[in-house]
């Protein structure tokens, strides 16, 4: 059986399984090329919502590297890199939006789930529904229907 993949969801699950026992969650996994080199970039956050430190990145990287070496999920050579969410923080779960109430988010609908494409402040979160202040009105959407990221950098850690 060939277990090689370039599927980000498989890589996401592999990385998340390796780092979650250490108190981290994987926010996203992307693959990009720098010249001929393939880079697998893993963006993590701490489950306790404290800032991600360099020591955290090192620990997560070591755990994931061991698992990636064991499973060998990618056919070609690649470089596995880890980073904290920073200013490009993806907002994936209701609790991520809740932490950022008052800040602007860049929002777009997932394919087949509406026609949203806007940047607006996060006003409220109730269950899995996020309300934005958009065009002077409240606009509520389900977290599962959108892809969102922070559009402004917070003045303090949230």
From Swiss-Prot:
User: Which Pfam families is this protein grouped with?
Assistant: DUF150_C, RimP_N
Record flagged with keyword Lyase? no
Annotated SUPFAM superfamilies = YhbC-like, C-terminal domain (SSF74942), YhbC-like, N-terminal domain (SSF75420)
Chief localisation class: cytoplasm
Q: Which GO terms describe its biological process?
A: ribosomal small subunit assembly; translation
* Subcellular locations according to the entry: Cytoplasm
Enumerate the UniProt keywords alphabetically: Cytoplasm, Ribosome biogenesis
**Entry keyword Methyltransferase:** no
Q: Name one GO cellular component term.
A: cytosol
Query: What domain of life does the UniProt record list for this protein's source?
Result: Bacteria
**HAMAP family membership:** RimP
Family as reported in the entry's similarity comment: Belongs to the RimP family.
> What is known about what this protein does?
Required for maturation of 30S ribosomal subunits.
Record-linked NCBIfam families: PRK14645.1
- Listed name of the protein: Ribosome maturation factor RimP
- Recorded source organism is Deinococcus radiodurans (strain ATCC 13939 / DSM 20539 / JCM 16871 / CCUG 27074 / LMG 4051 / NBRC 15346 / NCIMB 9279 / VKM B-1422 / R1)
Gene name, please?
A: rimP
């Amino acid at each position: 059986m060939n277990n090689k993949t370039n599927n980000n969801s498989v890589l996401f699950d592999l990385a998340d399984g390796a780092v979650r026992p250490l108190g981290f969650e994987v926010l996203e996994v992307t693959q990009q090329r720098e010249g001929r080199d393939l880079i697998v970039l893993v963006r993590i956050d701490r489950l306790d919502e404290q800032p991600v430190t360099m020591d955290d990145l090192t620990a997560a990287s070591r755990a994931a590297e061991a698992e990636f070496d064991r499973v060998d999920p990618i056919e070609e050579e690649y470089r596995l890199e880890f980073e904290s969410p920073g200013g490009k923080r993806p907002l994936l779960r209701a609790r991520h939006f809740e932490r950022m109430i008052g800040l602007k988010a860049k929002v777009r609908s997932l394919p087949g789930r509406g026609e949203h494409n806007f940047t607006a402040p996060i006003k409220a979160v109730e269950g899995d529904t996020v309300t934005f202040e958009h065009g002077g009105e409240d606009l509520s959407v389900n977290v599962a229907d959108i892809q969102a990221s922070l559009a402004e950098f917070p003045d303090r850690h949230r």
